[in-house]
Amino acid sequence: MGREKTLCKSWSDMKKHLNDTVSKSFIGRFFKLEARKTTFTTELRAATATFLTMAYIITVNANILADSGATCSINDCSTVASSSPPGPECVLGSNPGYEQCISRVKKDLVVATSLSAMVGSLAMGLLANLPFGLAPGMGANAYIAYNVVGFRGSGSISYHTAMAIVLLEGCAFLAVSALGLRGKLARLIPQTVRLACAVGIGMFIAFVGLQMNQGIGLVGPDKSTLVTLTACAETDPVTGACLGGKMKSPTFWLAVVGFLITSFGLMKNVKGSMIYGIVFVTAISWIRGTQVTIFPHTPLGDSNYNYFTKIVDFHKIQSTLGAISFTEFRKSEVWVAFATLFYVDLLGTTGVLYTMAEIGGFVEDGKFEGEYAAYLVDAGSSVVGSALGVTTTATFVESSAGLKEGGKTGLTAVIVGLYFLASMFFTPLVTNVPRWAVGPSLVMVGVMMMGVVKDIRWGETKEAVTAFVTILLMPLTYSIANGIIAGIGIYLALSMYDVVLGVAKWLNGVRKRVMREHNQVSSVATVEIV
C-alpha cells in the first residue's frame, strides 16, 4: 500500500511538473492555457477523447465515397477469358480489374480523409485557438456518392466534376465567411433554436450510436414501425434488419459493458472515462476466436486481420489527389448540387460550429473568441478536402466529447490533427476500432448535450413549439440542417402575428399623427379666413 501511494505521488508530481513547464512555455502562452484554466494533460485527454469518437469517419467516409466508384471507370475493367471488351455493366459485377481499382481508391480515400481532417483540425487550433476537430462530414458524402455521382458512377455527374462542385462551394462559402456574413447569420438564429440545436444534435448522435452500421446495433429497420428494437445475433448485412436472436447479439452486450464503464467513470468524475470504455471494448474485440471479435475466421476477416497485424502502413494517394474537372459545368444538375451543398453548409455547419462554441462555454453576448478565424477555417477546409478527393470538411459534433473531458484551447484541436497524421501511418489499427466500441461514447455524448434542455423556456408556447420541432426533426429526418430550417420556419411563422400587429400599430400611429397635423392646419386656415 505504501509503495502504491509513493508511485501515485510520484506520478502526480511528474504530471504537475509537466503541466507547469508547458504552461510557462511558448506553447502554453500561445494557447493561453493558464488564462483558460486548463493544463497540457487535460488538453491531451480531451484530444484523445475527440479523436477516438471521430476516428470512425476515416473508414466510413472512404467506404461511402468508394461506393460511387470515385475515379474508377469502365476503362479499369479487365477483359475476362479473352472475350470482347467489357461493357458498362462490368462496374456492377465482380470484374477483377474494377474491384482492384476500388480497393486502391479506398486506400486513397482513407489517407485523404485523414489528411483533410489533420489540416482542418490543425488550422482550427492554431488560427482560432478552439478545441474543435474537423473532418469530412456525414451527409455531404452520402449526397455526393449516391445522389450526384451515383452508385459506381451511375449518376449524371462524374466524380471529378463532383469534386469541382465541392471546390467551388468551398470557395463561395469561404467568401461568405471572409465578409463576416456567416457569423451574422448565425446570430440571427433565435436563441431557442440554438439551444434546441444542442439537444437535437445530441439525440442525432445518440441515434447514430444505437444503429447497426455505425453503433451498438440496439435499433434497426422495421417494415411496420420504421425502427424497432434489435440487437440481434443475425442481421441482414445490407439493410441491418433482424434475422433472428433478438437481444442476443454478443457485441451489443459487450458495448453495454463499455457504456457502463464510461458512465461509472463519469459518475465518479474519473478523468478519461470516455476513452476507457472505447479502449476496453476495442481490446476485447481484437481477440480472435471469440463471439465478439472483429476478425472472424472468414476470407474477409482473415484479410482484415493480416492487414491489422502490419500495424504500420503508409499508402501514397494515387488517383484522388487533384481529381477535379469543370468540363460538365454546363449541366443544370451541377448547379443544383452546388446550391444544395451551399445551403447545407450555410445552415448545418454554421449551426454545429456555433452550438459547439455554446457547449464549450465560449459564447458571450452572442459572440465567441476566435469566431471569425473559426468560420474561415471551417470553410477553407472544404477547399483543401476537395483537392484531396473528399467532400465537405466541417467541425464535428463529436468535438463535444473532448469538451466533456475539459478541452478549452486550440491545443486540443492541434493534438487531434496530430492523431489524424499518425492515423495515416497506423491505418491498420485505427480502421479496426469496431463500431460497437464507438457507439457507447456517441450515446454518452447525447446524454451530456441534453443538459441545455433546461434553459429552453418551455412555458412560452412559441419557444416550446420551436424547440420541440427542431429537436424532433434532427434524428427523425437524419438531418441537422432540416431541424434548423424547420425550427427557424416555425419561429418566424409564429412571430408573424406580433410583427403584423406591430406594423398595424405603427401605421395607426402614423395615421393619427397625419390626421392631427391635418386638423391643426385646417384650424389655422379657418382662423385666417375669419
UniProtKB/Swiss-Prot annotation:
Disruption phenotype: Resistance to 8-azaadenine and 8-azaguanine, and, to a lower extent, to 5-fluorouracil, but not to other toxic nucleobase analogs. Deficiency in the uptake of adenine and guanine. The keyword Transport applies. It is found in: Membrane. InterPro entries: Azg-like, NCS2. It comes from the Eukaryota. One of its GO terms (molecular function) is purine nucleobase transmembrane transporter activity. Its main location: membrane. It is a multi-pass membrane protein. The chain crosses the membrane at residues 46-66, 115-135, 161-181, 199-219, 247-267, 275-295, 334-354, 383-403, 410-430, 436-456, 463-483, 484-504. Keywords: Membrane, Transmembrane, Transmembrane helix, Transport. The keyword Transmembrane applies. GO terms for biological process: adenine nucleotide transport; adenine transport; guanine nucleotide transmembrane transport; guanine transport; purine nucleobase transport. Pfam families: Xan_ur_permease. Transports natural purines (adenine and guanine) as well as purine analogs. Confers sensitivity to 8-azaadenine and 8-azaguanine (8-azg). PANTHER family: ADENINE_GUANINE PERMEASE AZG2, XANTHINE/URACIL PERMEASE C887.17-RELATED. This is Adenine/guanine permease AZG2. It comes from Arabidopsis thaliana.
